[in-house]
């Protein structure tokens, strides 16, 4: 069936989140449209933008990646080739040389690159030893390294010739869920794992565990996501699989705040159902940080985080409700220069298989109005065990 999407006019609203917004000014957002990506038990894992925001890529539990217009929801095509769960996707950050290239890693042990103009695979790196790849990052002092987080290992390749240059296997004892090169120090690589450790490596020279592991942060519980924060990217936020939130200085290993009851603090900060899980953190630049929490019924809130000791989580400053009916897996907020003209806030995807596009809407009576496109990628129902997307 041909994929189509409804287009409708939306009002332009102020969409800037502020860490000082009073509770009475909480912004609620209404649906622009909703795209059903599949029938059955298939669902959305991750949504990422092309660098110029002319497309968004969406990874699905069908082991495929589909591309859409972030403004109209128009379907562009799909990248198909992985034989197991797609764990991470990202567009190339090189706006001049390869803005159309999309990268993906999978539990099938490969990292693949796709030309999103033709939707064809253009490169493939294979671990060759039944490894799963849970995360990847491009960087290095010469911008030639590709790091992959695997089972108990961090692998590094020279992506220019697909040659493996290092296997760091003594630093972690469990699945490596995250790898990130530091944006302004591309020779520095951070890895995070189910073992509760965040490791800092220097990737210059002949890379090995003994000489290039610079420091270790012990978070103490299984790590789900990490990300950079603050001027100079010196801080690191960390979300764990038991829904705790902590902020660290990765350079000296100090913990600025550890919110062990972050989910309870967020639940107490709004009038919706209890926050059941955290989706991600939002850091648009500078020192401001929001943690994005959701309910099992599909409502999502942006909660401002005060990470000065003793730390606190404030009243939700944005609420996305009425679009999903199950756990939300990914939230993608559009920058004002790309979504503002159309009054768009961003996109969400979840375990209900829906992609929801959100518009600003100050009128509370409009919050639950939605415009639903035709069913997309119609497939016959099939019996399939629904597995949570998990690194372990």
From Swiss-Prot:
Disruption phenotype: Fast germination rate, fast growth rate, increased biomass accumulation and early flowering. The keyword Repeat applies. One of its GO terms (biological process) is regulation of growth. The keyword Repeat applies. Gene3D superfamilies: YVTN repeat-like/Quinoprotein amine dehydrogenase. WD repeats lie at residues 81-124, 128-167, 171-211, 323-368. Keywords: Developmental protein, Growth regulation, Repeat, WD repeat. Expressed in germinating seeds, rosettes leaves, flowers and siliques. SUPFAM superfamilies: WD40 repeat-like. Involved in the control of plant growth development. Acts as negative regulator of seed germination, cell division in meristematic regions, plant growth and overall biomass accumulation. May function by regulating ribosome activities and biogenesis in plant cells. This is WD repeat-containing protein GTS1. It comes from Arabidopsis thaliana (Mouse-ear cress).
């Amino acid at each position: 069936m041909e994929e189509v999407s409804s287009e409708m006019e939306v009002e332009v609203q102020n969409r800037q989140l502020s860490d000082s917004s009073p509770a009475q000014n909480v912004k609620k957002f209404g649906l622009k449209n909703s795209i059903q990506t599949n029938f059955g038990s298939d669902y959305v894992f991750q949504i990422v933008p092309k660098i110029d925001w002319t497309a968004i890529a969406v990874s699905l539990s069908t082991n495929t990646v589909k591309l859409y217009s972030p403004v109209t929801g128009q379907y562009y095509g799909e990248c198909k080739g992985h034989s197991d769960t797609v764990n991470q996707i990202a567009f190339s950050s090189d706006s001049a040389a390869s803005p159309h290239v999309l990268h993906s890693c999978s539990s099938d042990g490969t990292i693949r690159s796709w030309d999103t103009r033709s939707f064809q695979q253009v490169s493939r790196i294979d671990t060759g030893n039944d490894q799963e790849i849970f995360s990847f990052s491009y960087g290095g002092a010469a911008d030639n390294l590709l790091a992959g987080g695997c089972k108990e290992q961090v692998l590094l390749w020279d992506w220019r010739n697909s040659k493996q240059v290092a296997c760091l296997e003594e630093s972690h004892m469990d699945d490596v869920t995250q790898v990130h090169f530091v944006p302004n120090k591309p020779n520095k690589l951070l890895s995070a794992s189910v073992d509760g450790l965040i490791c800092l490596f220097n990737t210059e020279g002949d890379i090995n565990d003994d000489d290039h592991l610079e420091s270790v942060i012990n978070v103490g519980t299984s790590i789900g996501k990490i990300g950079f924060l603050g001027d100079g990217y010196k801080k690191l936020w960390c979300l764990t699989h038991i829904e705790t939130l902590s902020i660290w200085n990765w350079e000296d290993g100090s913990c600025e705040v550890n919110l062990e009851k972050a989910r309870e603090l967020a639940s107490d900060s709004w009038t919706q159902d209890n926050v059941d899980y955290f989706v991600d953190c939002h850091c648009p630049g500078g020192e401001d940080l929001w943690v994005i929490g959701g309910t099992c019924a599909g409502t999502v809130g942006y909660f401002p985080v005060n990470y000065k000791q003793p730390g606190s989580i404030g009243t939700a400053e944005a609420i996305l409700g009425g679009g999903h009916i199950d756990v939300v897996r990914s939230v993608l907020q559009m920058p004002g220069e790309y979504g503002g003209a159309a009054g768009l806030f961003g996109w969400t995807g979840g375990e209900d298989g829906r992609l929801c596009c959100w518009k600003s809407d100050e009128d509370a009576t409009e919050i639950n109005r939605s415009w639903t496109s035709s069913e997309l990628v119609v497939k016959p129902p099939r019996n399939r065990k629904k597995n949570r997307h998990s690194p372990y």
